Amino acid sequence: MSSSSKIDSEKPVMVSESLFSTKTPIKTVKRQIFSSSPKPESVIKLPERFEILEEFFNGLDTAIRLLKLKGSSTTYANICPKIEYLTNRIFSYDHLAQMKHIYPEAIELKRVLKFVEDTCCMKPRLHIKLNTDAIVVEDTICGTKYMELRKVFHSKLVDFRKAHPKDEIPKELLPEPFNSPQRDSYSGIVSVGLGEPKLEVGGFDVHMEEIEQEEQDVNKVIPDSTLSHIESRIVETPVKDLSTPSKDLSTPIRLMSATPTLQLSKRCIELTPEGGDDNSLRSTNSLARGPSRSLNFDTFEEDAIEKDDIGNESDDKGINYEEDGLLQSVKGPSRSLNFDTLEEETIVKDDISNESGDEKSNYEGDNASDDDSLLQSMIERPKTEPEKHNLPQLVNLIHRVFHSTNRTVITKEELLYKIIANQINITDRREVEEQLSLMLQLVPDWISETKASSGDLLVRINKMSTAETVRARLEEATSHDISLIY
């Protein structure tokens, strides 16, 4: 009994040991299969630019899977930071275009519009998707399809490296407006050699090749006589084009030089004594300009002697210039610096300055009535045909300025500025002030001027009156004044 019980007690121990001993080799064999499977594959060394692109593709795969797990949209704006974090490199649209060229079946790009709350506008976004249906895998283990995509992408890089060992990877076109601006749109048409110098403007190279191709086609079809005629016309055309800028360049120079030349010649002709009477050569227009003072550093002693002689002669003549003095008070004196004037012009200017000095003494006591005399001279002065139409046009402009601002009161400075800015043919502020003062007197019930407590002049209009009635009254008043003058 004791021997049989010992045998029975030893059997289960042996069975348990045998069971444990048989399971252990199975696990080791399975681990050896999985660990030894990638060893037979030979890895081909790729250049650095190809390895960087492969890293970007692997990062793209990882970023898209992470965004899907998070529930976020797989747009370029969301994917780019993750790829740059995984690869520690800058990821751009050019890299995406190169990956699209290598594996177009797996990378799907789509342009979508997203509403931006800050700007309340629709902004385009680039949606990126990896198409796992591009490959067929028998094993459906999680992650196998994405790993197979990486292997296929690597094999395609190897194939491209073998076919084009020295070429760069082309860039596939992306949906607009995500194409790189530096990329040449004619890159697929024009091929430039590696040793040839490249132009800075890519479109110019294409344009020159198209012109050469057209010339070759013309040489094949058109006979020699017609071709020579066409070439002569082509040669003549640039000559006309080159002459046009010269005219344009000469025009402002001619205008700029003509204006001072006319003024100087007019003074010399009208005021320079040539053996006759000086009074017969003087005109009221030249005196209306007022005395002009110049600085001449060339002659000092001779000018002083001549000035004394001319001053004595002008005192003996005693010419009355009351009307010219009034015009001079309107226009005011003008001063200029002239370093190259002639001696005759200097003599005439001193003569005018001496005469104007006598006239100033007659009008110094009338400062209180300057405004009244200015307005009276503007009314009594004969108006030409263009000046008759200025006041109605000014009414339209003032009416438009007040209605555009939705105000009935505006400062005089602002009104004058807007009139000069909106009226092309008016450049003189004094002319606008004269017309405005005349209008204040002719139609006071429509436009009036008051002085504010701050000292500014305020102009007010009556918006109840229409512009048509004001123009009619103004035309009637101006025509009546002109008829009285004539």
Swiss-Prot record:
InterPro entries: Cdt1 (IPR045173), Cdt1_C (IPR032054), Cdt1_C_WH_dom_sf (IPR038090), CDT1_Gemini-bd-like (IPR014939), WH_DNA-bd_sf (IPR036390). Induction: Repressed by ABAP1. One of its GO terms (biological process) is chromosome organization. Keywords: Cell cycle, DNA replication, Nucleus. The keyword Magnesium does not apply. Residues 348-363 have a biased composition (Basic and acidic residues). Transmembrane segments: none annotated. GO terms for molecular function: cyclin-dependent protein serine/threonine kinase activity; DNA binding; DNA polymerase binding. GO terms for cellular component: nucleus. Expressed in proliferating (e.g. shoot and root apical meristems, organ primordia, guard cells and stomatal lineage) and endoreplicating cells (e.g. developing trichomes). Residues 273-294, 348-371 are annotated as: Disordered. Residues 281-294 have a biased composition (Polar residues). It holds the Pfam family CDT1_C. Its main location: nucleus. It is found in: Nucleus. Belongs to the Cdt1 family. Member of the pre-replication complex. Regulates endoreduplication. Involved in the coordination of cell and plastid division. This is CDT1-like protein b. It comes from Arabidopsis thaliana. The gene is CDT1B.
